[in-house]
Amino acid sequence: MIERRPFDRLGHANHGWLNARHHFSFADYYDPEREDWGRLRVWNDDEIAAGSGFPPHPHRDMEIITYVREGAITHQDSLGNKGRTEAGDVQVMSAGTGIVHSEYNLEAETTRIFQIWIIPDRRGDQPRWGSKPFPKAERDGRFVTLASGDEQDSEALHIRADAEVAAVTLKAGQSAEYALENGRRAYLVPATGSIEVNGVRAEARDGLAVRDEPTLKVTALEDSEVLLVEVA
């Protein structure tokens, strides 16, 4: 089963400095049929104006993954971490017992991100933050794991959840496959381009909610960049 969730039907909040679309219930947007997708709780599509951002605010017991689509985001937190994550790269924050952080677009242009929240396997762990650049060429034509709860994914950023975040870039006409074990779900969003997944078409920034599909064949109808989250 693959359900398409068109971009123009997502939850929407425009605060001037922040133009946000919500794939799942978030803040003032509530849809009882879109509370979560397995352990995936939030997928926000955020456009952050130059010189603005999120002032210090707290989180607790959530795995928060930020994928930068365009521009860069600068993070600072109560643990003393500070870092800048650029387009195509990922940062992970395990909120654990509690962390206060800020995220600002210090660039001269709009920054566009996907922010993803995944429910952790357990509560009350120590908070932490990490960021990592990923060579863009490695994901040409094949899925590359960016963040994972599997210790064997040693090249990926670690998250404390039974989940995986992967990305692929495809030229028009090119395909890549992703295998899902029995009972697991996936959620895909083409950051750019247009794709077809097992016969279901999605345009840029649409969501595809997937379950009961052992193999996903992702075909680019035009040059595309795709982000996928696999969860229990």
UniProtKB/Swiss-Prot annotation:
InterPro entries: Pirin, Pirin_N_dom, Quercetinase_C, RmlC-like_jellyroll, RmlC_Cupin_sf. Pfam families: Pirin, Pirin_C_2. Its EC number is 1.13.11.24. The keyword GTP-binding does not apply. One of its GO terms (molecular function) is metal ion binding. It catalyses: quercetin + O2 = 2-(3,4-dihydroxybenzoyloxy)-4,6-dihydroxybenzoate + CO. A divalent metal cation binds at residues 57, 59, 101, 103. This is Putative quercetin 2,3-dioxygenase PA1210. It comes from Pseudomonas aeruginosa (strain ATCC 15692 / DSM 22644 / CIP 104116 / JCM 14847 / LMG 12228 / 1C / PRS 101 / PAO1).
